[in-house]
UniProtKB/Swiss-Prot annotation:
InterPro entries: Fe/S_biogenesis_protein_NfuA, FSCA_dom_sf, HesB-like_dom_sf, NIF_FeS_clus_asmbl_NifU_C. One of its GO terms (biological process) is iron-sulfur cluster assembly. It comes from the Bacteria. [4Fe-4S] cluster binds at C151, C154. Homodimer. Involved in iron-sulfur cluster biogenesis. Binds a 4Fe-4S cluster, can transfer this cluster to apoproteins, and thereby intervenes in the maturation of Fe/S proteins. Could also act as a scaffold/chaperone for damaged Fe/S proteins. Its cofactor is [4Fe-4S] cluster. SUPFAM superfamilies: Fe-S cluster assembly (FSCA) domain-like, HesB-like domain. This is Fe/S biogenesis protein NfuA. Binds 1 [4Fe-4S] cluster per subunit. The cluster is presumably bound at the interface of two monomers.
Length: 199
């Protein structure tokens, strides 16, 4: 079920009225659903733009059309028009299932480690232009990672590994015993913090 607040409905209705196109609605879809890059897309939709298999949700003065393939990813979504602390108003979409769900405890350790790396660790590292890739997960629970982007050659990679990544993986994936770095940091060509200046 998708919830759309009264404020969001009023916001959309005013935008649609301004367009002046009979039958215009709003189409909601999931982009890259089930991945860390997943996002929700809202766009105007004229009747001719619709494929006919969308789910239609009647709103106050317009219809919200949900692309059929996106319906499972949008279950539980909330669309609102909120006032931020700065006084600005902003449309917000919360879609808790859009990036997929964490693997079950019965999933392999490799699947669970990869999910945490892709959905929790890499989004944080991306703020520095960095990322990590899982190279191997041993039977003993040792995770071997390769740093890339701004983390490749970074003078703070050891701190990131021990205080950030290892803590996160050991706390979120039962069975992980250690996290090791397999990166040749001397070959990094654009580190966020050069190794010789991290002291």
């Amino acid at each position: 079920m998708i919830q759309i607040s009264d404020k969001a409905q009023t916001y959309f209705r005013k935008l649609i009225e301004r367009e002046g196109v009979p039958g215009m609605g709003v189409r909601l879809s999931a982009v890259d659903a089930g991945t860390p890059r997943a996002d929700a897309r809202l766009e105007f939709a004229e009747p001719a733009d619709l494929s006919g298999d969308e789910w239609a949700i009647d709103c106050d003065g317009f219809t919200l059309y949900v692309v059929a393939a996106s319906v499972p990813w949008m279950d539980g979504a909330e669309i609102d028009y909120v006032t931020q602390s700065t006084g600005n108003q902003q449309l917000t979409i919360k879609a808790p299932k859009i990036k997929g769900e964490a693997p079950a405890e019965s999933a392999s350790m490799v699947e669970r480690v990869r999910w945490v790396v892709e959905n929790e660790i890499n989004p944080q590292l991306a703020s520095h232009g960095g990322r990590v890739a899982v190279q191997e997960v041993s039977a003993e629970g040792v995770v071997l990672l390769r740093f890339g982007g701004g983390c490749h050659g970074c003078g703070m990679a050891d701190v990131t590994l021990k205080q950030g990544i290892e803590k996160t993986l050991m706390g979120r994936v039962p069975g992980v015993t250690a996290v090791r770095d397999a990166t040749d940091h001397a070959t990094g060509d654009a580190p966020y913090i050069p190794r010789d200046s991290a002291a």
